[in-house]
Amino acid sequence: MNNEELRALNQKRKIYQIAWVTRDLEKSMKAWVDNLKIGPWTVLTFTNQSLKYLKVDDKTVTEPFKFLIGISWIGDMQLELIEPVYGPTIYEAFIQKHGEGLHHIKERIADDAIEGVVQGYRDKGIGVTQTGQFETDFHYYLDTEPKVDFILELGNCPILQLTPDKFSTYPSENA
């Protein structure tokens, strides 16, 4: 692929999210609000009850798991903070290996293209370390870290219309 073709290809791509892992979601959200004026944060809890499925290293997770996420926006860029609570996830494994910090960037891929894109990466020897689905939102974390020193996540990135019982907001309106 020449440079012109590479530029044309990348003009069509969309980096949707940048994400960090943390041991304490509330402490991290507070720090981002207080120091960076980034917020409010939509807070969600993911468990074996709320996800349709979760696979780590191509194996379906059958034991209980829980992780918390906070989502905020700067312009059209989604920022995500993730706190692993228990159970097998790549988030806990990352913290054990690297500590807290930048975890991944996420590229938006159309629903009808995702399987082909994932297969294209598999054909290059880049596997999937974790995949799951919440409502209509699905994600694939690719094993890109050994090749490019960061994790690439692929997902369809739909705008979900969640009922108030499925999320909270930080800081609360009453804070």
Residue ranges of model-derived segments:
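Vicinal oxygen chelate
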Residues: N2-N10, Y16-V21, G39, V43-E80, P84-A113, E115-A175, ...
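Mid-sequence acidic-hydrophobic segments that form the walls
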Residues: P88, R108, D112, G120, ...
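Conserved active-site tyrosine of GNAT-family acetyltransferases
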Residues: A31-V33, Y121
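Short helix/turn-capping signatures at newly exposed starts of structured segments
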Residues: K12-Q17, D34, E80
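Residues within well-ordered alpha-helices
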Residues: S28-M29, L68, V117
